[in-house]
From Swiss-Prot:
SUPFAM superfamilies: Nucleotide-diphospho-sugar transferases
Name of this chain's protein: Alpha-1,3-mannosyl-glycoprotein 2-beta-N-acetylglucosaminyltransferase
Keywords attached to this entry: Coiled coil, Glycoprotein, Glycosyltransferase, Golgi apparatus, Manganese, Membrane, Metal-binding, Signal-anchor, Transferase, Transmembrane, Transmembrane helix
PANTHER family in alphabetical order: ALPHA-1,3-MANNOSYL-GLYCOPROTEIN 2-BETA-N-ACETYLGLUCOSAMINYLTRANSFERASE, PROTEIN O-LINKED-MANNOSE BETA-1,2-N-ACETYLGLUCOSAMINYLTRANSFERASE 1/ALPHA-1,3-MANNOSYL-GLYCOPROTEIN 2-BETA-N-ACETYLGLUCOSAMINYLTRANSFERASE
Catalytic residues, chain numbering: 287 (proton acceptor)
Residues engaged in binding Mn(2+): 211
Length: 444
Protein backbone atom coordinates (compact mmCIF):
# COMPACT_ATOMS: atom_id res chain seq x y z
CA UNK A 1 0.00 0.00 0.00
CA UNK A 2 2.78 2.35 0.91
CA UNK A 3 4.47 1.48 -2.40
CA UNK A 4 1.35 2.39 -4.33
CA UNK A 5 1.07 5.72 -2.49
CA UNK A 6 4.69 6.50 -3.32
CA UNK A 7 4.12 5.71 -6.98
CA UNK A 8 1.13 8.04 -7.07
CA UNK A 9 3.21 10.85 -5.61
CA UNK A 10 5.81 10.33 -8.27
CA UNK A 11 3.10 10.46 -10.92
CA UNK A 12 1.66 13.66 -9.47
CA UNK A 13 4.99 15.48 -9.77
CA UNK A 14 5.03 15.40 -13.63
CA UNK A 15 1.38 16.26 -13.65
CA UNK A 16 2.08 19.26 -11.44
CA UNK A 17 4.92 20.34 -13.69
CA UNK A 18 2.66 19.92 -16.72
CA UNK A 19 -0.06 21.98 -15.03
CA UNK A 20 2.40 24.70 -14.13
CA UNK A 21 3.76 24.72 -17.72
CA UNK A 22 0.27 24.96 -19.15
CA UNK A 23 -0.57 27.82 -16.80
CA UNK A 24 2.61 29.62 -17.79
CA UNK A 25 1.83 29.19 -21.51
CA UNK A 26 -1.70 30.41 -20.93
CA UNK A 27 -0.38 33.42 -19.06
CA UNK A 28 2.14 34.12 -21.81
CA UNK A 29 -0.54 33.84 -24.49
CA UNK A 30 -2.88 36.07 -22.52
CA UNK A 31 -0.09 38.62 -22.14
CA UNK A 32 0.56 38.58 -25.89
CA UNK A 33 -3.13 39.03 -26.65
CA UNK A 34 -3.29 41.81 -24.08
CA UNK A 35 -0.30 43.53 -25.72
CA UNK A 36 -1.88 43.16 -29.16
CA UNK A 37 -5.18 44.45 -27.86
CA UNK A 38 -3.45 47.41 -26.27
CA UNK A 39 -1.58 48.11 -29.52
CA UNK A 40 -4.81 47.87 -31.50
CA UNK A 41 -6.56 50.23 -29.11
CA UNK A 42 -3.62 52.63 -29.35
CA UNK A 43 -3.69 52.45 -33.18
CA UNK A 44 -7.42 53.02 -33.17
CA UNK A 45 -7.00 56.03 -30.94
CA UNK A 46 -4.25 57.36 -33.24
CA UNK A 47 -6.40 56.84 -36.35
CA UNK A 48 -9.32 58.51 -34.62
CA UNK A 49 -7.08 61.44 -33.72
CA UNK A 50 -5.80 61.69 -37.30
CA UNK A 51 -9.32 61.48 -38.68
CA UNK A 52 -10.44 64.24 -36.38
CA UNK A 53 -7.46 66.31 -37.54
CA UNK A 54 -8.33 65.68 -41.18
CA UNK A 55 -11.97 66.53 -40.53
CA UNK A 56 -10.86 69.78 -38.90
CA UNK A 57 -8.51 70.52 -41.84
CA UNK A 58 -11.24 69.78 -44.40
CA UNK A 59 -13.60 71.99 -42.45
CA UNK A 60 -11.07 74.83 -42.47
CA UNK A 61 -10.45 74.41 -46.21
CA UNK A 62 -14.16 74.31 -46.89
CA UNK A 63 -14.48 77.56 -45.02
CA UNK A 64 -11.66 79.00 -47.13
CA UNK A 65 -13.33 77.78 -50.33
CA UNK A 66 -16.57 79.44 -49.30
CA UNK A 67 -14.66 82.64 -48.53
CA UNK A 68 -12.85 82.49 -51.88
CA UNK A 69 -16.14 81.90 -53.71
CA UNK A 70 -17.59 84.93 -51.97
CA UNK A 71 -14.52 86.95 -52.95
CA UNK A 72 -14.79 85.73 -56.56
CA UNK A 73 -18.47 86.68 -56.68
CA UNK A 74 -17.63 90.15 -55.39
CA UNK A 75 -14.83 90.49 -57.94
CA UNK A 76 -17.16 89.33 -60.71
CA UNK A 77 -19.64 92.00 -59.69
CA UNK A 78 -16.87 94.60 -59.62
CA UNK A 79 -15.68 93.40 -63.05
CA UNK A 80 -19.16 93.83 -64.49
CA UNK A 81 -19.28 97.34 -63.06
CA UNK A 82 -15.83 98.13 -64.48
CA UNK A 83 -16.83 96.80 -67.90
CA UNK A 84 -19.93 98.98 -67.85
CA UNK A 85 -17.77 101.94 -66.88
CA UNK A 86 -15.26 101.18 -69.65
CA UNK A 87 -18.06 100.87 -72.19
CA UNK A 88 -19.41 104.23 -71.08
CA UNK A 89 -16.01 105.88 -71.50
CA UNK A 90 -15.50 104.14 -74.85
CA UNK A 91 -18.86 105.34 -76.12
CA UNK A 92 -18.02 108.86 -75.06
CA UNK A 93 -14.62 108.54 -76.71
CA UNK A 94 -16.06 107.21 -79.97
CA UNK A 95 -18.71 109.92 -79.99
CA UNK A 96 -16.02 112.54 -79.53
CA UNK A 97 -13.77 111.04 -82.20
CA UNK A 98 -16.55 110.75 -84.79
CA UNK A 99 -18.42 113.94 -84.00
CA UNK A 100 -19.35 116.18 -86.86
CA UNK A 101 -20.91 113.39 -88.87
CA UNK A 102 -17.71 112.49 -90.72
CA UNK A 103 -17.32 108.76 -91.25
CA UNK A 104 -13.81 107.53 -90.40
CA UNK A 105 -11.65 105.95 -93.06
CA UNK A 106 -10.48 103.35 -90.56
CA UNK A 107 -9.91 102.82 -86.88
CA UNK A 108 -6.23 102.51 -85.96
CA UNK A 109 -5.36 100.09 -83.18
CA UNK A 110 -1.97 99.64 -81.53
CA UNK A 111 -1.67 96.12 -80.14
CA UNK A 112 0.18 96.22 -76.82
CA UNK A 113 1.06 93.91 -73.97
CA UNK A 114 3.92 94.58 -71.58
CA UNK A 115 6.39 97.01 -73.21
CA UNK A 116 5.53 100.47 -71.95
CA UNK A 117 8.70 102.06 -73.34
CA UNK A 118 8.08 100.64 -76.81
CA UNK A 119 4.44 101.71 -76.66
CA UNK A 120 5.39 105.29 -75.83
CA UNK A 121 7.70 105.47 -78.83
CA UNK A 122 5.02 104.03 -81.13
CA UNK A 123 2.24 106.33 -79.93
CA UNK A 124 4.51 109.36 -80.24
CA UNK A 125 5.18 108.48 -83.87
CA UNK A 126 1.52 107.78 -84.65
CA UNK A 127 0.22 110.96 -83.00
CA UNK A 128 2.71 113.05 -84.98
CA UNK A 129 0.84 112.25 -88.19
CA UNK A 130 -2.57 111.18 -86.86
CA UNK A 131 -3.45 114.37 -84.99
CA UNK A 132 -4.22 116.44 -88.14
CA UNK A 133 -6.50 113.65 -89.45
CA UNK A 134 -7.84 112.35 -86.14
CA UNK A 135 -11.46 112.44 -87.26
CA UNK A 136 -10.62 110.10 -90.15
CA UNK A 137 -8.53 107.72 -88.06
CA UNK A 138 -9.80 107.21 -84.47
CA UNK A 139 -6.91 105.82 -82.45
CA UNK A 140 -7.08 102.91 -80.00
CA UNK A 141 -4.67 101.02 -77.79
CA UNK A 142 -5.64 97.42 -77.11
CA UNK A 143 -3.71 95.91 -74.22
CA UNK A 144 -3.47 92.19 -73.65
CA UNK A 145 -3.13 91.50 -69.94
CA UNK A 146 -2.77 93.71 -66.92
CA UNK A 147 0.74 95.17 -67.05
CA UNK A 148 0.28 98.29 -64.95
CA UNK A 149 2.98 100.35 -66.67
CA UNK A 150 1.36 99.81 -70.08
CA UNK A 151 -2.09 100.56 -68.70
CA UNK A 152 -0.94 103.76 -67.01
CA UNK A 153 0.89 104.90 -70.13
CA UNK A 154 -2.17 104.16 -72.30
CA UNK A 155 -4.53 106.04 -70.01
CA UNK A 156 -2.21 109.05 -69.96
CA UNK A 157 -3.20 109.92 -73.55
CA UNK A 158 -6.45 111.81 -74.04
CA UNK A 159 -6.22 111.54 -77.85
CA UNK A 160 -7.07 107.85 -77.95
CA UNK A 161 -9.36 105.14 -76.57
CA UNK A 162 -8.01 102.40 -74.33
CA UNK A 163 -9.22 98.80 -74.48
CA UNK A 164 -8.07 95.96 -72.23
CA UNK A 165 -8.21 92.24 -73.03
CA UNK A 166 -8.22 90.10 -69.88
CA UNK A 167 -8.08 86.38 -70.67
CA UNK A 168 -7.76 83.94 -67.78
CA UNK A 169 -8.28 80.76 -69.79
CA UNK A 170 -5.16 78.54 -69.61
CA UNK A 171 -3.18 78.16 -72.83
CA UNK A 172 -2.82 74.59 -74.07
CA UNK A 173 -0.26 74.38 -76.88
CA UNK A 174 -0.74 71.90 -79.70
CA UNK A 175 2.91 70.81 -79.73
CA UNK A 176 5.45 70.43 -76.88
CA UNK A 177 7.87 73.30 -76.44
CA UNK A 178 5.77 75.94 -78.21
CA UNK A 179 5.74 79.47 -76.85
CA UNK A 180 2.38 80.28 -75.31
CA UNK A 181 2.86 83.91 -76.39
CA UNK A 182 1.79 83.11 -79.95
CA UNK A 183 -1.49 81.64 -78.67
CA UNK A 184 -2.15 84.67 -76.47
CA UNK A 185 -1.40 87.03 -79.37
CA UNK A 186 -3.90 85.23 -81.61
CA UNK A 187 -6.60 85.47 -78.92
CA UNK A 188 -5.87 89.16 -78.43
CA UNK A 189 -6.09 89.93 -82.15
CA UNK A 190 -9.45 88.20 -82.49
CA UNK A 191 -10.86 89.97 -79.44
CA UNK A 192 -9.62 93.42 -80.52
CA UNK A 193 -10.86 93.10 -84.10
CA UNK A 194 -14.22 91.78 -82.91
CA UNK A 195 -14.49 94.81 -80.64
CA UNK A 196 -13.66 97.32 -83.36
CA UNK A 197 -15.71 95.77 -86.15
CA UNK A 198 -18.75 94.50 -84.25
CA UNK A 199 -18.98 96.62 -81.12
CA UNK A 200 -17.77 99.95 -82.51
CA UNK A 201 -19.01 99.26 -86.07
CA UNK A 202 -15.96 100.45 -87.98
CA UNK A 203 -15.86 99.45 -91.64
CA UNK A 204 -12.05 99.20 -91.74
CA UNK A 205 -9.28 98.71 -89.20
CA UNK A 206 -5.54 99.41 -89.45
CA UNK A 207 -3.50 97.18 -87.15
CA UNK A 208 -0.19 98.35 -85.72
CA UNK A 209 2.02 96.75 -83.09
CA UNK A 210 3.63 98.41 -80.10
CA UNK A 211 7.10 98.47 -81.67
CA UNK A 212 6.47 100.45 -84.86
CA UNK A 213 7.07 103.94 -86.18
CA UNK A 214 5.16 105.25 -89.19
CA UNK A 215 6.04 107.34 -92.26
CA UNK A 216 4.75 110.89 -92.92
CA UNK A 217 2.37 109.68 -95.65
CA UNK A 218 1.14 106.62 -93.71
CA UNK A 219 -2.47 107.78 -93.41
CA UNK A 220 -2.73 109.20 -96.94
CA UNK A 221 -1.40 105.88 -98.24
CA UNK A 222 -4.07 103.90 -96.42
CA UNK A 223 -6.81 106.28 -97.54
CA UNK A 224 -5.81 105.63 -101.14
CA UNK A 225 -5.61 101.91 -100.41
CA UNK A 226 -9.12 101.98 -98.89
CA UNK A 227 -10.53 103.40 -102.09
CA UNK A 228 -8.67 100.78 -104.11
CA UNK A 229 -9.96 97.94 -101.91
CA UNK A 230 -13.54 99.18 -102.34
CA UNK A 231 -13.12 99.00 -106.12
CA UNK A 232 -11.35 95.63 -106.25
CA UNK A 233 -12.69 92.72 -104.19
CA UNK A 234 -9.66 90.58 -105.09
CA UNK A 235 -7.55 92.68 -102.69
CA UNK A 236 -7.78 91.01 -99.28
CA UNK A 237 -5.76 93.59 -97.34
CA UNK A 238 -3.33 96.47 -97.78
CA UNK A 239 -0.01 96.58 -95.94
CA UNK A 240 2.55 99.28 -95.25
CA UNK A 241 5.35 96.69 -95.16
CA UNK A 242 7.81 95.18 -97.63
CA UNK A 243 9.75 92.16 -96.33
CA UNK A 244 12.57 93.01 -98.74
CA UNK A 245 12.38 96.71 -97.89
CA UNK A 246 15.96 97.02 -96.66
CA UNK A 247 17.81 100.17 -97.77
CA UNK A 248 19.89 98.36 -100.39
CA UNK A 249 16.82 96.81 -102.10
CA UNK A 250 14.45 99.79 -102.51
CA UNK A 251 14.40 103.07 -104.40
CA UNK A 252 10.98 104.37 -105.50
CA UNK A 253 8.63 105.70 -102.74
CA UNK A 254 5.79 105.89 -105.29
CA UNK A 255 5.94 102.22 -106.33
CA UNK A 256 3.24 99.82 -105.13
CA UNK A 257 2.84 96.12 -105.88
CA UNK A 258 0.35 93.29 -105.58
CA UNK A 259 1.56 90.21 -103.71
CA UNK A 260 0.31 86.69 -103.06
CA UNK A 261 2.16 86.73 -99.71
CA UNK A 262 0.53 88.46 -96.71
CA UNK A 263 3.07 91.06 -95.46
CA UNK A 264 1.53 92.08 -92.11
CA UNK A 265 3.34 94.62 -89.89
CA UNK A 266 0.99 97.55 -90.35
CA UNK A 267 -2.00 96.45 -92.40
CA UNK A 268 -5.65 97.24 -93.08
CA UNK A 269 -8.65 95.00 -93.68
CA UNK A 270 -12.37 95.50 -94.20
CA UNK A 271 -15.25 94.30 -92.06
CA UNK A 272 -16.50 92.02 -94.84
CA UNK A 273 -13.15 90.22 -94.77
CA UNK A 274 -13.24 89.95 -90.99
CA UNK A 275 -16.74 88.47 -91.20
CA UNK A 276 -15.12 85.62 -93.09
CA UNK A 277 -12.02 85.24 -90.90
CA UNK A 278 -13.34 85.74 -87.38
CA UNK A 279 -15.33 82.47 -87.04
CA UNK A 280 -12.34 80.34 -88.04
CA UNK A 281 -9.53 82.43 -86.53
CA UNK A 282 -6.59 80.16 -85.54
CA UNK A 283 -5.39 79.36 -82.03
CA UNK A 284 -1.86 80.61 -82.83
CA UNK A 285 0.41 81.87 -85.62
CA UNK A 286 -2.35 83.98 -87.15
CA UNK A 287 -0.06 85.66 -89.72
CA UNK A 288 1.21 82.39 -91.19
CA UNK A 289 -2.39 81.15 -91.18
CA UNK A 290 -3.40 84.12 -93.35
CA UNK A 291 -0.66 83.11 -95.80
CA UNK A 292 -2.29 79.74 -96.47
CA UNK A 293 -3.95 79.53 -99.87
CA UNK A 294 -7.06 78.00 -98.32
CA UNK A 295 -7.58 81.24 -96.39
CA UNK A 296 -6.68 84.00 -98.86
CA UNK A 297 -8.37 82.02 -101.67
CA UNK A 298 -6.51 83.59 -104.56
CA UNK A 299 -6.92 87.14 -103.27
CA UNK A 300 -3.87 89.34 -103.01
CA UNK A 301 -2.33 92.09 -100.93
CA UNK A 302 -1.11 95.59 -101.72
CA UNK A 303 2.38 96.47 -100.50
CA UNK A 304 4.72 99.43 -101.07
CA UNK A 305 8.28 99.21 -102.31
CA UNK A 306 9.44 101.55 -99.53
CA UNK A 307 7.98 100.67 -96.12
CA UNK A 308 5.54 103.01 -94.39
CA UNK A 309 6.26 101.34 -91.04
CA UNK A 310 9.53 100.64 -89.26
CA UNK A 311 9.75 97.79 -86.75
CA UNK A 312 12.20 98.68 -83.98
CA UNK A 313 11.25 95.82 -81.64
CA UNK A 314 14.41 93.78 -81.27
CA UNK A 315 13.05 92.02 -78.19
CA UNK A 316 9.60 90.47 -78.53
CA UNK A 317 7.76 87.20 -79.02
CA UNK A 318 10.03 86.27 -81.93
CA UNK A 319 13.01 86.71 -79.57
CA UNK A 320 14.78 89.13 -81.90
CA UNK A 321 15.02 86.56 -84.69
CA UNK A 322 16.57 87.99 -87.89
CA UNK A 323 16.37 91.53 -86.44
CA UNK A 324 19.85 92.65 -87.36
CA UNK A 325 19.69 91.19 -90.88
CA UNK A 326 16.14 91.89 -91.98
CA UNK A 327 14.43 94.45 -89.70
CA UNK A 328 17.05 96.93 -88.55
CA UNK A 329 18.14 97.90 -92.13
CA UNK A 330 14.55 98.59 -93.28
CA UNK A 331 14.13 101.92 -95.07
CA UNK A 332 11.26 103.95 -93.60
CA UNK A 333 9.81 106.27 -96.22
CA UNK A 334 10.67 109.92 -95.59
CA UNK A 335 9.04 111.38 -98.72
CA UNK A 336 5.56 112.89 -98.47
CA UNK A 337 3.65 111.38 -101.38
CA UNK A 338 0.39 113.01 -102.49
CA UNK A 339 -1.55 109.78 -102.85
CA UNK A 340 -4.79 111.61 -103.65
CA UNK A 341 -3.20 112.78 -106.89
CA UNK A 342 -1.94 109.30 -107.84
CA UNK A 343 -3.87 107.07 -110.22
CA UNK A 344 -3.71 103.59 -108.71
CA UNK A 345 -5.84 101.99 -111.38
CA UNK A 346 -2.84 99.93 -112.54
CA UNK A 347 -3.12 97.93 -109.28
CA UNK A 348 -6.59 96.55 -109.99
CA UNK A 349 -6.78 92.90 -110.96
CA UNK A 350 -7.69 93.58 -114.56
CA UNK A 351 -4.73 95.89 -115.14
CA UNK A 352 -1.94 94.71 -112.88
CA UNK A 353 -1.02 91.46 -114.62
CA UNK A 354 -0.52 93.33 -117.88
CA UNK A 355 1.46 96.09 -116.14
CA UNK A 356 3.70 93.72 -114.18
CA UNK A 357 4.27 91.30 -117.07
CA UNK A 358 5.50 94.27 -119.11
CA UNK A 359 8.15 95.02 -116.47
CA UNK A 360 9.28 91.39 -116.38
CA UNK A 361 9.30 91.07 -120.18
CA UNK A 362 11.55 94.12 -120.58
CA UNK A 363 14.10 92.84 -118.05
CA UNK A 364 17.25 91.24 -119.46
CA UNK A 365 17.54 87.50 -118.69
CA UNK A 366 20.71 86.26 -116.99
CA UNK A 367 21.69 82.79 -115.79
CA UNK A 368 24.59 80.66 -114.61
CA UNK A 369 27.00 81.46 -111.79
CA UNK A 370 28.04 84.80 -110.29
CA UNK A 371 24.50 86.15 -110.69
CA UNK A 372 25.03 89.06 -108.29
CA UNK A 373 28.11 90.22 -110.18
CA UNK A 374 26.34 89.87 -113.53
CA UNK A 375 23.33 91.84 -112.29
CA UNK A 376 25.57 94.62 -110.97
CA UNK A 377 27.38 94.92 -114.30
CA UNK A 378 24.20 95.31 -116.37
CA UNK A 379 22.63 98.76 -116.61
CA UNK A 380 19.09 97.48 -117.18
CA UNK A 381 16.59 95.49 -115.12
CA UNK A 382 17.41 91.76 -115.07
CA UNK A 383 15.42 88.60 -114.59
CA UNK A 384 16.64 85.27 -113.26
CA UNK A 385 14.74 82.00 -113.61
CA UNK A 386 14.59 79.52 -110.73
CA UNK A 387 13.27 75.99 -111.12
CA UNK A 388 12.18 75.20 -107.55
CA UNK A 389 12.28 76.36 -103.92
CA UNK A 390 15.79 75.04 -103.33
CA UNK A 391 17.21 77.03 -106.23
CA UNK A 392 15.24 80.13 -105.21
CA UNK A 393 16.68 79.94 -101.69
CA UNK A 394 20.20 79.66 -103.09
CA UNK A 395 19.76 82.70 -105.37
CA UNK A 396 17.97 84.74 -102.67
CA UNK A 397 20.79 83.92 -100.26
CA UNK A 398 23.36 85.23 -102.72
CA UNK A 399 21.56 88.58 -103.01
CA UNK A 400 20.65 88.74 -99.30
CA UNK A 401 16.85 88.91 -99.58
CA UNK A 402 14.37 86.76 -97.66
CA UNK A 403 14.61 83.07 -98.57
CA UNK A 404 11.44 81.98 -96.75
CA UNK A 405 8.36 80.45 -98.41
CA UNK A 406 4.89 79.78 -96.99
CA UNK A 407 2.51 77.35 -98.65
CA UNK A 408 4.46 77.44 -101.90
CA UNK A 409 4.78 81.24 -102.07
CA UNK A 410 8.05 83.18 -101.55
CA UNK A 411 7.86 86.34 -99.46
CA UNK A 412 6.66 89.37 -101.50
CA UNK A 413 6.00 87.20 -104.59
CA UNK A 414 3.37 87.89 -107.24
CA UNK A 415 2.65 84.83 -109.38
CA UNK A 416 5.99 83.40 -108.27
CA UNK A 417 7.98 86.54 -109.16
CA UNK A 418 9.98 88.32 -106.45
CA UNK A 419 11.19 91.81 -107.35
CA UNK A 420 13.73 94.03 -105.58
CA UNK A 421 16.20 96.77 -106.49
CA UNK A 422 19.93 96.50 -106.87
CA UNK A 423 22.25 99.53 -106.90
CA UNK A 424 19.29 101.91 -106.43
CA UNK A 425 17.23 102.09 -109.61
CA UNK A 426 17.58 98.73 -111.37
CA UNK A 427 15.17 95.90 -110.64
CA UNK A 428 15.96 92.22 -110.24
CA UNK A 429 13.11 89.79 -110.97
CA UNK A 430 13.40 86.23 -109.65
CA UNK A 431 11.01 84.35 -111.92
CA UNK A 432 9.42 81.03 -110.99
CA UNK A 433 8.98 77.99 -113.25
CA UNK A 434 5.30 78.80 -113.94
CA UNK A 435 5.51 82.59 -113.69
CA UNK A 436 5.96 83.31 -117.39
CA UNK A 437 2.85 81.29 -118.22
CA UNK A 438 0.81 82.92 -115.42
CA UNK A 439 1.87 86.38 -116.60
CA UNK A 440 1.06 85.57 -120.21
CA UNK A 441 4.59 86.30 -121.41
CA UNK A 442 5.51 84.67 -124.70
CA UNK A 443 8.87 84.12 -126.37
CA UNK A 444 10.81 85.05 -123.22
Amino acid sequence: MARISCDLRFLLIPAAFMFIYIQMRLFQTQSQYADRLSSAIESENHCTSQMRGLIDEVSIKQSRIVALEDMKNRQDEELVQLKDLIQTFEKKGIAKLTQGGQMPVAAVVVMACSRADYLERTVKSVLTYQTPVASKYPLFISQDGSDQAVKSKSLSYNQLTYMQHLDFEPVVTERPGELTAYYKIARHYKWALDQLFYKHKFSRVIILEDDMEIAPDFFDYFEAAASLMDRDKTIMAASSWNDNGQKQFVHDPYALYRSDFFPGLGWMLKRSTWDELSPKWPKAYWDDWLRLKENHKGRQFIRPEVCRTYNFGEHGSSLGQFFSQYLEPIKLNDVTVDWKAKDLGYLTEGNYTKYFSGLVRQARPIQGSDLVLKAQNIKDDVRIRYKDQVEFERIAGEFGIFEEWKDGVPRTAYKGVVVFRIQTTRRVFLVGPDSVMQLGIRNS
